[in-house]
């Protein structure tokens, strides 16, 4: 039976040595028979959210996010922003939020080159989702079973610029992608551990502790794993 790693963490094994994925934790936004898409959640860039908003000519109306780094989400489309946030409900929105979305940015799923140089899958944020969650108020959003959403349209930034928007947010430039069967092969080759995702690791855990915290979800510590040790 095919595995579905949507709303899971991939935890890099020590054998994965490249700069992008070494000691990385990847939050899986979508996984299907066509491929997989995720965001690295523990590789901050040198850019702060405040600097990013200045770059796109928007103020940042959320002082709590001003010094938060923008993350290096993966090697595909590193010029584009991807906003991971709680699924929007009345309790997860700060301040007033305009329910009328602006025009969406380019959708996810355009062909790209992940770290392994294989083509990225054609995944779309606009495709139907089996989750019972209500639709996001934003124009281009992938609703992820497990209570999170990934938005690629500018309207989420506009909401944050007014002091509104999701309470908990991670913004990345770029994403990680795997072609059909590629991720399954990498797991079989012992490149990754997998575990159900816990949003607290993404939003409530210091960046430098996220790798160890994700491992702890499996009852492991970093000293307990080594190249070729097997995966959970």
Predicted regions span which residues?
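Residue-identity detector for glycine
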Residues: 95, 109-115
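Short, low-complexity, intrinsically disordered N-terminal modules
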Residues: 105-108, 122
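Short Gly/Ser/Thr- and charged-rich N-terminal loops/segments
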Residues: 104, 113, 117-118
